[in-house]
Regions:
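Structural/interface elements that position substrates and couple domains in central-metabolism enzymes
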Residues: 1-435
Length: 435
């Protein structure tokens, strides 16, 4: 069985590496020649724990990397994992998935194979049926789900945990008609993941499942952040104890109840916005979803309000941001709350210094020379008026009274509450903790 994977980003490269490491014959396709060359040499374009190690195992076994779609001609299975980024209006950009499906169609026109095409890219309901299938049929001059199969197969990977999630998914979702291709798809996934629950449904349902999943996670985060704001205004209230207590209720669960600066990354903000736009487009009131999104945006404003309260004017004040990645163990800054904070601080004419063990290069691509970048914590804190801990990198746990001596104002805003209980010798504010 030969497997083709189109799009070697976070999802596609993780999938290609894991399957190849398990001795499946895998061809990874990406139109970026430079990226392909790096991957061929065992270098990952993104920082993800265990990805490079798994990639190199896969390359030693059967993984082939190419930028030529013609390599898909002999594939039995094709996974489409290209990006669907957010447009300025909040809708998703489908140009890459259109290009990928068009190329697949042209390739299978010349092939004697009857492949199954799995759409793993996150797309709004109706995309497979109204866009993907017509393009494939037009370009291949063949009939979908007769001459080749098309199945919606959303992914649920977490950044910083992608390899584990690829190996051990919590569920397999397969959307499409009950054909011989669906029967074969079930058998394939039963072989790869024999103990994982499988849900077989329609195209549109499989597509909305991904949005339902991510919007619910975003809702939990905004909910705990709203409670965090309340706790912060109650003397001695502790949001972590609140989260721990309600998380013990099996109807709620403990995951995604860590209060902080808000949700970010490549999925939750994009998918929440896309779902709101989709709901509006079909005439459904999305007031609740909009409230979740509004609460998320307000978190950064709350941090700036606290900063202004303690510093007065922040114009020309040195503000240190610790962590620009949207979460630890990644270099991804897409929709990072740190980036949002920096942009707003720059509008207030603050002088920004940033530190991050993995994401500085990506941060430079956004801000260039507008802010200062440092690789040592000492340089980050030196003469700083205020330090804001945004990302929970383990090395920030080491901050103490001695660390802060070189600061000018010794004001610490800890959005992750990692320094609670430490004697810092300055003014310390932990988000979600009442004073």
């Amino acid at each position: 069985m030969r497997i083709g994977i189109i799009g070697l980003g976070f999802v596609g490269l993780s999938l290609a590496s894991v399957l190849a490491s398990k001795n499946y014959n895998v061809i990874g396709i990406d139109t970026d020649k430079k990226k392909c060359l790096e991957i061929e040499n065992g270098i990952t374009p993104i920082f993800e724990p265990n990805l490079e190690k798994t990639l190199r195992i896969g390359l030693k076994k059967s993984l082939i990397i190419s930028n030529e779609f013609s390599c898909l001609k002999d594939c039995d299975i094709i996974f489409v994992t290209v990006g669907t980024p957010q447009k300025n209006n909040g809708k998703i950009e489908l140009s890459m998935i259109k290009k990928a499906t068009s190329a697949i169609g042209q390739t299978i026109r010349k092939s004697k194979k009857n492949p199954i095409i799995f759409i793993k890219s996150t797309v709004i309901p109706g995309t497979v049926e109204n866009i993907v299938l017509p393009i494939l049929e037009k370009q291949s001059r063949k009939k979908a789900n007769k001459d080749f199969g098309v199945i919606s197969n959303p992914e649920f990977l977490q950044e910083s945990n992608a390899i584990h999630d690829t190996k051990y998914p919590h569920a397999i979702i397969l959307g499409g008609p009950e054909t011989k291709y669906m029967k074969k798809a079930k058998a394939i996934f039963l072989k790869i993941h024999p103990n994982v629950k499988m849900i077989i449904t329609k195209y549109q349902t499989a597509e909305i499942i991904k949005y339902a999943n991510n919007s619910f996670l975003a809702t939990k985060i905004s909910f705990i952040n709203q409670l965090s704001n309340i706790c912060q205004n109650i003397p001695n209230a502790d949001i972590d104890d609140v989260a721990k207590a309600i998380g013990l209720d099996p109807r709620i669960g403990k995951l995604f109840l860590n209060a902080g600066p808000g949700y970010g990354g490549s999925c939750l903000p994009k998918d929440m916005s896309a779902l709101i736009n989709f709901a509006d487009s079909i005439g459904v009131n999305s007031t609740f979803l909009k409230a979740v999104e509004k609460t998320n945006h307000e978190q950064i404003d709350n941090i700036i309000s606290l900063m202004k309260k303690e510093l007065g004017k922040i114009k020309c004040k040195k503000i240190t941001i610790l962590g620009t990645a949207f979460k630890p163990n990644t270099n991804d800054i897409r929709a990072s709350k740190s980036i949002e904070l920096i942009k707003k601080l720059l509008k207030n004419n603050a002088k920004i210094t940033v530190h991050d063990p993995k994401a500085l290069e990506n941060t430079k691509k956004i801000f260039g020379s507008k802010i200062n970048y440092v690789t040592s914590l000492q340089d980050a804190l030196d003469k700083s008026h205020c330090v804001v801990i945004m990302t929970h990198w383990k090395q920030y746990n080491q901050l103490n009274k001695n660390s802060l001596r070189i600061m000018k104002s010794k004001i610490v805003i800890d959005t992750r509450r990692i320094l609670i209980g430490k004697e810092l010798g300055g003014r310390y504010f932990a988000v979600g903790i009442g004073r």
